[in-house]
């Protein structure tokens, strides 16, 4: 609302800010170059464009900055996801992705809560929303510097400067996770030939391979031709519609009669539930996956349960809670239901990411994550406009937000928006259940094909001692480059 007033944009125009499309090029780049540098550049671009949005004076300027900002974010997410998959074995990837989801959700919650409350103020003489964007820009640039200085891509350790003239010890070549072993089961850094010799014997996958169109077409065809990938993407497309539709929750709470502060804290409570739910779902997927090894059934069953329980809970939230009168009296009830709702419906993302990591050889993981984000983001973004269209043209929403014709109109608008939200959440979730069911038959064979492809190509050197040594050398070299 604050951005809309400042840039003279309607709500429908502001919705286009969330429809900026990004390219899967970032995944193709991340699979061939050091992903830590790709992530650092993405954070830097993200920070600069976020500052540009905060300084925009028209919707056109904001749209251009937002589009470039989306590309910076696209550089970050697929590469970070593939790095997490490389650092963790299959039976702990769900929890690892859950931790990433937890931190992302907590950051988004804190940012949204802060921006909502600072939007009506004028810190340092500027509009509150502009100040919030500039603050995020500063944090993004600092993050870029930290990633550049300290992050290490395990896939590129075989040619990292820390290896030259050093020794490797206790390293194993694995296709799914990191390992270190030596005689007696402990890692060792002695007794092996110099790293340069090891590197010369067998380089990692495409260590210095140039980015050619033939390789791009090959990778794209492999990824898009995987049946389980197609199914998970279809599930993700329809499954992201409810999440985008939930951006209307704040408007819905305000129409119910909650103050701006109460609406913000309720949404923060919902975000906390989602953050913890991601970690819970990933952990449950890992545990059930260990009980059903070498199959996707454990993670898929966890996802199906999350989708299934979300349907009745969404009905309780949108239609079963008291409305009207003094809504402050129902603040605790709404907060409890929103927390449990978020805790229950957020299990799928972490398990889907863990499943993706097993569908392709590890040197194509950035590509598969990038295409997933591209398809889901482009089509799933329709959720927000669908809610508005359904509320206005199907369920009879009248007027504009902030201008109503009295309590009767407000109540009818609440009912219309609640019904639209319910339809745009439950119907996609029904399709999600069907798509997840298909994975029980397709995933195992697709995973077997990925392992066969992985065995045909050289695997990277991996090991925790090597990661630590490379990180130390990277920091030392950066310090040495600084002028005294």
Where are these regions (language model features)?
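Helix-loop-helix hairpin linking two adjacent transmembrane segments in secondary transporters
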Residues: 100-154
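Residue-level signature of mid-helix packing/kink "hotspots" within the transmembrane helices
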Residues: 16-24, 74, 108-109, 271-279, ...
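Conserved MFS/SLC helix-loop-helix module at the cytosolic interface between two early adjacent transmembrane helices
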Residues: 21-59
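Symmetry-related core transmembrane helices of the 12-TM Major Facilitator Superfamily/SLC fold
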Residues: 130-149, 310, 418-437
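Structural signature of the two symmetry-related core transmembrane helices
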Residues: 37-51, 297-315
């Amino acid at each position: 609302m604050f951005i809309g007033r400042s840039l003279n944009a309607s709500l429908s125009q502001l919705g286009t800010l969330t429809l900026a499309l990004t390219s899967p090029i970032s995944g193709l780049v991340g699979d061939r170059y050091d992903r830590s540098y790709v992530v650092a550049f993405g954070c830097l671009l993200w920070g600069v464009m976020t500052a540009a949005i905060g300084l925009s004076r028209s919707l056109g300027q904001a749209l251009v900055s937002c589009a470039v900002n989306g590309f910076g974010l696209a550089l970050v997410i697929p590469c970070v996801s593939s790095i997490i998959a490389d650092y963790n074995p299959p039976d702990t990837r769900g929890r690892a992705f859950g931790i990433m989801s937890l931190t992302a959700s907590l950051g988004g919650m804190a940012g949204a809560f802060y921006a909502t409350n600072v939007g009506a103020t004028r810190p340092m003489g500027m509009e509150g929303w502009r100040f919030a964007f500039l603050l995020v820009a500063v944090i993004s640039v600092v993050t870029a510097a930290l990633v550049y200085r300290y992050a290490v891509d395990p896939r590129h350790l075989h040619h990292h400067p820390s290896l030259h003239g050093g020794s490797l010890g206790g390293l194993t070549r694995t296709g799914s996770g990191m390992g270190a072993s030596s005689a007696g089961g402990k890692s060792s850094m002695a007794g092996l030939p110099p790293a340069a010799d090891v590197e010369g014997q067998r380089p990692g996958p495409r260590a210095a391979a140039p980015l050619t169109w033939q390789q791009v077409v090959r990778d794209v065809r492999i990824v898009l031709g995987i049946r389980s990938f197609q199914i998970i993407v279809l599930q993700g497309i329809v499954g992201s519609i409810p999440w985008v539709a939930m951006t209307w929750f704040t408007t819905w709470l305000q129409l119910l009669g909650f103050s701006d502060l109460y609406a913000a804290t309720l949404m923060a409570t919902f975000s906390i539930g989602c953050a913890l739910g991601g970690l819970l779902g990933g952990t449950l997927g890992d545990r059930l996956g260990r009980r059903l090894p070498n199959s996707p059934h454990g993670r898929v069953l966890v996802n199906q349960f999350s989708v299934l329980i979300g349907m009745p809970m969404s009905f309780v939230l949108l239609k079963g809670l008291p409305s009207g009168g003094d809504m402050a009296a129902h603040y605790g009830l709404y907060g409890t239901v929103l927390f449990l709702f978020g805790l229950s419906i957020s299990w799928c993302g972490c398990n889907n990411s863990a499943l993706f990591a097993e569908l392709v050889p590890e040197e194509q993981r950035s590509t598969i994550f990038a295409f997933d984000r591209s398809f889901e983001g482009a089509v799933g973004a329709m959720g927000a406009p669908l809610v508005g269209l359904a509320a206005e043209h199907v369920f009879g929403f009248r007027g504009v937000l902030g201008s109503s014709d009295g309590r009767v109109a407000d109540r009818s608008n609440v009912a219309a928006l609640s019904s639209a939200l319910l339809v745009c959440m439950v119907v996609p979730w029904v399709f999600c259940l069907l798509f997840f069911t298909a994975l029980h038959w397709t995933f195992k064979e697709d995973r077997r094909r990925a392992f066969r492809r992985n065995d045909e190509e050289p695997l990277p050197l991996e090991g925790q001692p090597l990661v630590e040594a490379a990180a130390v050398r990277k920091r030392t070299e950066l310090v040495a480059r600084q002028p005294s």
